[in-house]
A protein has these predicted regions:
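Active-/binding-site microenvironments in catalytic and ligand-binding cores
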Residues: 5-221
Length: 221
């Protein structure tokens, strides 16, 4: 998830900027969420009887005891006839609010094996943030290095080492609709390079991806 903290004189406000993980029209890859309700706990409890590594003899005895009712778990076995609730979720790593690891982009990064998501230091994921506003950009338009420099000049800010830059385009207002995926601006190569060379450690954006939509990139290519 993504949070933004606003520090006041004596307190800090934490704002959750992340999207919910849920099936919707903005996600090009399917999300499946299967929920086992509390009322279905007895079915889960039934599986527990046969779980674990057992000898064939023990398994046979477990079946006999279950069929005879000696080890049978039903709704009545639980207080209020309820058991634990659980969810099984199937999704892409490129779902909702997420962090792309260097390994997402290729097999080499700066001449080395790129870091996978579990190798990303947590220190990379928090720090001082600055919001750059490009809400004036339309679908498939490019955010140039000149745009970035002008915005920094407008807010009177000089990028610092290890800053986290959040790119605002207001594309997130389309979340839940199909056009969220294909109607968004994107960072140019030069603009991204400028941020990286300025010492920025994380770049966030409210679009599906940091680049322009796939269809626009393919057409340009």
């Amino acid at each position: 998830f993504l949070v933004f903290c606003i520090r006041g004189n004596s307190s800090m406000k934490i704002i959750d900027l992340s999207f919910n993980v849920e099936p919707n029209l903005s996600e090009p890859m399917s999300i499946k969420i299967k929920t086992r309700p509390h009322s279905g706990g007895s079915k889960f409890g039934r599986k527990i009887v046969f779980m674990g590594k057992r000898s064939l003899k023990d398994k046979a005895m477990a079946v006999i005891h279950y069929m005879s009712g000696k080890e049978r778990i039903t709704k009545k076995s639980f207080p209020d006839q309820e058991f634990i609730n659980e969810q099984r979720i199937s999704l892409s790593v490129h779902t909702g609010t997420h962090l792309d690891a260097p390994s997402h982009f290729g097999t080499r990064c700066e001449g080395k094996r790129p870091k996978t998501i579990d190798e990303i230091p947590l220190e990379w994921c928090y720090g001082n943030g600055v919001v750059l506003n490009f809400c004036n950009k339309g679908p498939c338009e490019e955010i140039s290095v000149e745009d970035v420099k002008k915005e920094l000049e407008r807010i009177e800010y000089c990028l610092q080492e290890n800053d986290i830059v959040l790119i605002r385009t207001d594309t997130d207002k389309k979340w839940g609709k199909p056009n969220y995926f294909y109607e968004a601006p994107g960072m140019s190569r030069e603009a991204t390079k400028f941020l990286v060379e300025s010492g920025v450690k994380i770049i966030g954006i409210d679009c599906y991806s940091l680049d322009k939509p796939f269809m626009a990139m393919v057409k340009q290519y």
